[in-house]
Amino acid sequence: MTKLENRSAHQKSHQNPHQWLLTGINWREVRLAYQVFLRNPGTGILHILRAQRQSIWQRWVSRRLAGQAADLMGRTIVIDLVELSKLPPDTLGGIYARHMVSLGLDPQAFATPEDNWIEQRTAVGHDIFHVIAGYDASPVGEFAVAAFTLAQYWDLLNVFVLSFVPLSLTNPLWTFPLLGAVVRGFRMGLTSAPVVAYAVEDNWEKPLHLVRQELGIGHYFRNAD
């Protein structure tokens, strides 16, 4: 081993674990994400996805999620909103399709050709999480879903989104609803079985309340259901 390699190994052995996770992050993309997120959240998210793609943190997340979803290895989620819209309005697929169509959303908006199977499942999972966790696409709902997802994934993207919570608390009308939604979303995410391991493509026709029960979060919706 050369002196340079020895020095690198020595530095890594003494590196803070949190610093090690940040290795490989594209900080230019992070800066761009912060510059545009409030004006254009979708563009900000795309910047963060690019920022984390080659990071050790994201590799750790992907390996852990792939392990949780090992029974689905190699499977991607194919979504046909036209067909799903024909399902009853109380089903997972029916509610998801109506959510997407009403907001004019593209299920593949955050997926890229470079994604492997687990990355594709997580890329299309955001709005599925909205439906399962019961949150709309309002700012409060988005923060709550980010908290739910962070508890499941422990990823950079949702850390980034939640970093805007303190700024949002400056709006007095949001303070208590926002804090309550974020805490509830995080607790629900910790309680839920891994949603990434749930074969949504096999359960579109299932009533949403049964999906929630199978994931272990049905009790959060007793009054709603």
Where are these regions (language model features)?
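Long, solvent-exposed, polar/charged low-complexity segments
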Residues: 2-8, 12, 16-23, 29, ...
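Core of folded catalytic or high-affinity ligand/protein-binding domains
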Residues: 63-213
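The feature captures two recurrent sequence modes
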Residues: 1-82
